[in-house]
């Protein structure tokens, strides 16, 4: 079986933990992860001034698709940049139309709203993004730490990054694969 493929879209202002933890966990699970810079291949300044080097530009990554999952990290500025990008919209619309998994964390789900993705789904966000996400009646809201509704997987924030990442692994590769990755991490149950 071919290995699963993930696209993580990295925008200026992305939340570091919500980017790096899912990338790390998915790679531990054998998922081929591409970290794509929204603005190109140059290092990206994240929300806490950590610089992350993307693997490639989003334009180049788009040509290498399709992906089994598209991941949107949070961070207020990062989510705003994702929300304003026509390329992100195109990728998300294509992912939704081909029934591929879309995963977003913290403020990241607001990009789903901006691009009209997953309307009717139950979602969660960072508490600070709830009002924005619920503007209109496009989604139902959950206070769960991770919420999966069909092919839309959302989570709350930096403190839920491991759970979010493991939920992506489980959705793509099964519970056994997620459990194998989780075991040596010494996570609190």
Curated annotation (Swiss-Prot):
One of its GO terms (cellular component) is nucleus. Sumoylated on Lys-130 by PIAS2 or PIAS4; which is essential for cell-growth promoting activity and transforming activity. Undergoes cleavage of a C-terminal peptide and subsequent activation of protease activity in response to oxidative stress. A lipid is attached at residues 46, 53, 106 (S-palmitoyl cysteine). Pfam families: DJ-1_PfpI. The modification N6-succinyllysine is found at residue 182. The modification N-acetylalanine is found at residue 2. Deglycase activity does not require glutathione as a cofactor, however, glycated glutathione constitutes a PARK7 substrate. The modification Cysteine sulfinic acid (-SO2H) is found at residue 106. It catalyses: N(omega)-(1-hydroxy-2-oxopropyl)-L-arginyl-[protein] + H2O = lactate + L-arginyl-[protein] + H(+); N(6)-(1-hydroxy-2-oxopropyl)-L-lysyl-[protein] + H2O = lactate + L-lysyl-[protein] + H(+); S-(1-hydroxy-2-oxopropyl)-L-cysteinyl-[protein] + H2O = lactate + L-cysteinyl-[protein] + H(+); N(omega)-(1-hydroxy-2-oxoethyl)-L-arginyl-[protein] + H2O = L-arginyl-[protein] + glycolate + H(+). The keyword Ribonucleoprotein does not apply. Gene3D superfamilies: 3.40.50.880. The record marks 149-150 as: Cleavage. GO terms for molecular function: copper ion binding; glyoxalase (glycolic acid-forming) activity; mercury ion binding; mRNA binding; oxidoreductase activity, acting on peroxide as acceptor; peptidase activity; protein deglycase activity; protein homodimerization activity. The modification N6-acetyllysine is found at residue 148. Multifunctional protein with controversial molecular function which plays an important role in cell protection against oxidative stress and cell death acting as oxidative stress sensor and redox-sensitive chaperone and protease. It is involved in neuroprotective mechanisms like the stabilization of NFE2L2 and PINK1 proteins, male fertility as a positive regulator of androgen signaling pathway as well as cell growth and transformation through, for instance, the modulation of NF-kappa-B signaling pathway. Homodimer. Binds EFCAB6/DJBP and PIAS2. Part of a ternary complex containing PARK7, EFCAB6/DJBP and AR. Interacts (via N-terminus) with OTUD7B. Interacts with BBS1, HIPK1, CLCF1 and MTERF. Forms a complex with PINK1 and PRKN. Interacts (via C-terminus) with NCF1; the interaction is enhanced by LPS and modulates NCF1 phosphorylation and membrane translocation. Interacts with NENF. This is Parkinson disease protein 7 homolog.
């Amino acid at each position: 079986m071919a290995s699963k493929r993930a696209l993580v879209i990295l925008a200026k202002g992305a939340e570091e933990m919500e980017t790096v933890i899912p990338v790390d966990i998915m790679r531990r699970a054998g998922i081929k992860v591409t970290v794509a810079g929204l603005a190109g291949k140059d290092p990206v300044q994240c929300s806490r001034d950590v610089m992350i080097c993307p693997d490639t530009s989003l334009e180049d990554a788009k040509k290498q698709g399709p992906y089994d999952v598209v991941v949107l990290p949070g961070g207020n500025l990062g989510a705003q940049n994702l929300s304003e990008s026509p390329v992100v919209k195109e990728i998300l619309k294509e992912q939704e139309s081909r029934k591929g998994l879309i995963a977003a964390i913290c403020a990241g789900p607001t990009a789903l709203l901006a691009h009209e993705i997953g309307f009717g789904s139950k979602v969660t966000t960072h508490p600070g993004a709830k009002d924005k996400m619920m503007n209109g009646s496009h989604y139902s809201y959950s206070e769960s730490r991770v919420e999966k509704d069909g092919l839309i997987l959302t989570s709350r924030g930096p403190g839920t990054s491991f759970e979010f990442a493991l939920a992506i692994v489980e959705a793509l590769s099964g519970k056994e694969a997620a459990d194998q990755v989780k075991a040596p991490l010494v996570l609190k149950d």
